[in-house]
Amino acid sequence: MKLTCALIVAMLFLTACQLTTTDDSRGRQKYPTERLRVKMRNPKLSKLTKTCDPPGDSCSRWYNHCCSKLCTSRNSGPTCSRP
């Protein structure tokens, strides 16, 4: 009797584990790499594309998003410069 109860509990536990870990892919794209390729072709869709500041824009030691990665100090303050 105890063995039967233990087997039933084990089967219920394994069934519950399978139900919670199944992939619910309903309504999703079959191949996620294809979705990534589409995003790479269209940069407006991609969140991975970063914008940079052109030469002449203001920058600082802590905020340097210059396209050239060069932030030089001038009389008017630090600005992005050309390489």
From Swiss-Prot:
Organs and tissues of expression: Expressed by the venom duct.
Cell compartments where the protein resides: Secreted
Q: Which InterPro entries match?
A: Conotoxin
Highest taxon above the source species: Eukaryota
Q: Which residues form the propeptide?
A: 23-50
Alphabetically sorted, this entry's keywords are: Disulfide bond, Knottin, Neurotoxin, Secreted, Signal, Toxin
What stretch or stretches form a coiled coil here? Answer: none
Name which cysteines form disulfide bonds: 52-67, 59-71, 66-80
- Signal peptide feature range: 1-22
What Gene Ontology molecular-function terms does this entry list?
ion channel inhibitor activity; toxin activity
Cellular component annotations (GO), alphabetically ordered = extracellular region
Record text about domains = The presence of a 'disulfide through disulfide knot' structurally defines this protein as a knottin.
Q: Which family does it belong to?
A: Belongs to the conotoxin O1 superfamily.
Name of the protein in its database record: Conotoxin LiCr95
**Biological source species:** Conus lividus (Livid cone)
